[in-house]
């Protein structure tokens, strides 16, 4: 319950900070040197001492290592925003390192920071970094690691890992897509076909997809779901190409889950004059000023509040309440996934009846009344059987 209270508090405090993406072949970083007299929560508030680490807040270093790059208006930017919010709250030194999707940089970059005593906590996202975290954490048992969007099945005593229940949010996105494609909405056609464009295949992306499929088919089992993979999270041209191709095959709504590459998918939907569904942040609102043409076709987004997750986990680590060696899953009940509904596009595109239906589905899902399947921990044969139901 304490963890959920912290989440609830930070939901109102975290602000989205977007930064431009840097190079792809060498790890790049952005460092924030917070005030050394920053305070902590609990009994030591105002004294600047973090008892869990035996240091003043300003002497603590927290580094965020991202598998890809900032500038995605999605999970990377949100994660960095969460780090910066926590740094402002506690006063520790913060650094964000971008790996640019280069797998050869994962282990050496983590080793560099694990061997440097100036860095007390290494936060890693997302699932593609799991094996590297496990390797380096075993090599450096005194270094603390926070891994999000992946589970450390080894239960290493210096690692806290967690998954977002993106399947739950994606289920709602699927329901939204199905409601539009079967309606008389201006951009809907008669094909009863929707799409999904993912970045690179991994467990987290499969979790999005399985939830999306189930959500679509909960409305109409005969809806055809086109599935395409970009192969990485940075190729915006490929993302756009796949969106245009799916539109040509009859899709009138596409769910984009592909990081920076997903911005290309959203642009492809706008070019093809079909609806798109964004991911992680409210991408309609985020893109409205910089790319209003693309934003105009985003009917909603499945948010995943990685900013809240990162800031909450760091806060718990500094407060001494994070259970190292354990694993958690946060979803609808924790307020970290859901649909972006508080914007003009959602309110104008969906009818009152559709909005009421979506509210009811979200309420039932949050209350645990719906059995939403998850790819996390699922047998691969079962997973493939479910994924095969997408195409009719």
What is each model feature region?
Residues 1-13:
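Positively charged n-region of N-terminal signal peptides that target proteins for export
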Residues 24-29, 33-392:
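A residue-level marker of the well-folded mature domains of exported/periplasmic proteins
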Residues 18-21:
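C-terminal motif of bacterial Sec signal peptides marking the signal peptidase cleavage site
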